[in-house]
A protein has these predicted regions:
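GT-A fold catalytic core of metal-dependent nucleotide-sugar glycosyltransferases
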Residues: 59-61, 65, 81-137, 164-165
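A glycosyltransferase accessory/donor-loop signature
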Residues: 2, 6, 160, 165-330
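Short internal beta-strands
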Residues: 27-35, 126-128
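Active-site-proximal specificity loops/subdomain of glycosyltransferases
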Residues: 42, 46-91
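Short alpha-helix within the catalytic core of nucleotide-sugar-dependent glycosyltransferases
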Residues: 15, 42-46, 108-120, 176
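Short, charged/polar "capping" segments at the starts of alpha-helices
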Residues: 35-42, 134-135
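Short, acidic, metal-binding catalytic loop of nucleotide-sugar glycosyltransferases
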Residues: 16-25
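Conserved catalytic core of nucleotide-sugar-dependent glycosyltransferases
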Residues: 116-179
Length: 330
């Protein structure tokens, strides 16, 4: 689910699917969007799968009637399309099983391996969200969930960025209808993710951590004890914290995303965007440092009654340091 502004990131995600796809399988990739797309934008995105006969990429434009069940829901600063996954059982009425993927991911292993996982009779397969469980969240988060489900166990709370869905079973048991009802009458901090965890509380299958390696949980070894967490093998990397296209330095796995991005027609756009972001960050850091320098110098003047020429020399010294670090132009 994405609007036109997210198509460049969709392209990277789809490209990673193409590059890990097996020639023995056929892959049907659907991108749902909430507005009609100009031909030029559509063609640029579809170019990602050009020459790959076993990967089909289709854009599905949703009408207002399709989105009516999620219109007006609390989004907490996110796009309303975040609730789109709750509509999948009805939108994919002719499908028995599907994989849902967030946009901010890179696929590192053939998705056919995930698609074939036995859910053991459950309706939804997902990976435990170590980042949410281990990191401090406001008490309101737990209170909201427990109000709807008093015996809720937060131990197996899952991340909704990668979902293996038993669509046939979900439609039969109306589990997604329940999730929608929960989302409508609550303002959950984590929106539809909280609603999904409650609605599927007894019908969840925990997938191996490799299928949704959230970057927020990287410093933490999941309770599964899987060696894949900081190792080489990662089925899907999910950039849940700092997005790689925004800050490469603060993301240890950003290179994986940029490696795939370099083989899309959006690569130059990403580079220009990163350069603009870098300039803004450097300008902000420079302003903060200059403010700190002036404040520090003012304090010294007040304490030691320094002559003005010493004050000027002090600023000059720090200015030179800023230039050396590339934070200030000469």
């Amino acid at each position: 689910f994405a609007d036109c502004n997210y198509f460049p990131y969709v392209a990277v995600a789809v490209r990673s699917i193409v590059e890990t796809a097996s020639s023995e399988n056929a892959y049907d990739v659907l991108v749902f969007t909430d507005a009609d797309v100009r031909t030029s934008i559509r063609e640029r995105l579809l170019d990602v799968t050009r020459g790959c006969s076993n990967v089909s990429l289709r854009l599905v434009v949703l009408e207002k009637t399709d989105l009516a069940p999620i219109s007006g829901l609390f989004v907490g600063g996110l796009s309303a399309m975040t609730y789109g996954r709750l509509l999948l059982p009805s939108l994919l009425a002719n499908y028995r099983r599907a994989i849902y993927l967030d946009v901010d991911i890179v696929v590192r292993e053939d998705l056919a391996h995930l698609f074939g996982v036995d859910l053991k009779g459950n309706l939804l397969g997902a990976v435990k969200d170590e980042g949410v469980i281990r990191f401090p969240f406001p008490p309101q988060w737990r209170e909201d969930i427990l109000r709807e489900c008093p015996d809720f166990d937060f131990g197996p709370y899952v991340n909704a960025g990668v979902l293996l869905m038993n669509l046939e079973g979900i439609r039969r048991e109306k589990s997604m209808v329940r999730a929608l009802e929960l989302a409508v009458r609550n303002r959950f901090i984590l929106c539809d993710q909280d609603a999904l965890n409650i609605a599927f509380v007894h019908r969840l299958f925990l997938l191996p951590v490799q299928w949704n390696q959230c970057t927020k949980a990287l410093p933490i070894e999941p309770s599964t004890g899987s060696p894949d967490v900081l190792g080489v093998h990662r089925g899907i990397v999910h950039f849940t914290e700092v997005k790689p296209w925004r800050d490469l330095r603060r993301n240890t796995l950003a290179w994986m995303w940029w490696d795939v991005a370099s083989r899309t027609s959006y690569y130059r756009d990403f580079l220009l965007m990163a350069e603009r972001t870098n300039r803004l960050v450097r300008a902000k850091v420079c302003d903060l440092l200059k403010l700190w320098i002036v404040t520090r110098a003012d304090n010294r003047l007040a304490r030691h009654k320094c002559p003005s020429f010493l004050f000027a020399a002090h600023l000059s010294k720090w200015r030179n340091k800023l230039v050396e670090k590339g934070l200030l132009a000469e």
